[in-house]
Amino acid sequence: IEMITVVFQPYAVKALFHIPSHLFHGQNVDTDAMEDVELSDLVKQVTDTSDNAVSIRLIEQFFLRRLYTLPEYNLKRMFHEINLQPQINIAHLSETACLSSKQFGRIFADYVGTTPKEFIRIVRMQRALSMLQQDATIPFVQVAYECGFSDQSHMIKEFKLFSGYTPAEYLSVCAP
């Protein structure tokens, strides 16, 4: 194997490596730059083996060991709530986490690399894209409603901001 890539959930980088996620936003990170002795040992073990299955098992075991020692911040529950209710607001999330909005925002950004509001916008956009890819004939007003946008014009504005296209333009360029 020349290269192994590990893709993390939004909250995992901070939890596993104690490094704020925003430092990794949009980056490919070399493990040497992370200054983590255990991670360096893992890289050496993986490099020394020629069996891909063994390499994957070593990586899985490493991350599972780290997961079992994590403090409980309950961020996974927050992600689940955001995915279930895209119209959810930050006040509700911070209340659920038993934190002030400001403290919740800081912890969330530290783990995820973006603000809760921006993350919710991304989830809404992903959901809208998914709905349009599954059914190009679905009315935009229905997509807006089901994805938690305040109205269709708000969805179109966000869609254009994220993708550079309106939903109609997107469908004509990237037909499912």
Give residue ranges: language-model regions.
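Alpha-helical bundle regulatory/interaction domains
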Residues: 1-91, 95-101, 115, 130-133, ...
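Conserved structured core elements
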Residues: 98, 119-122, 153
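Short conserved catalytic/interaction loops centered on acidic-Pro-aromatic/His motifs
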Residues: 104, 114-120
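Basic, nucleic-acid-binding surfaces and adjacent catalytic neighborhoods in DNA/RNA-processing proteins
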Residues: 107-111, 130
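A secondary-structure capping/hinge motif
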Residues: 110-114, 158-168
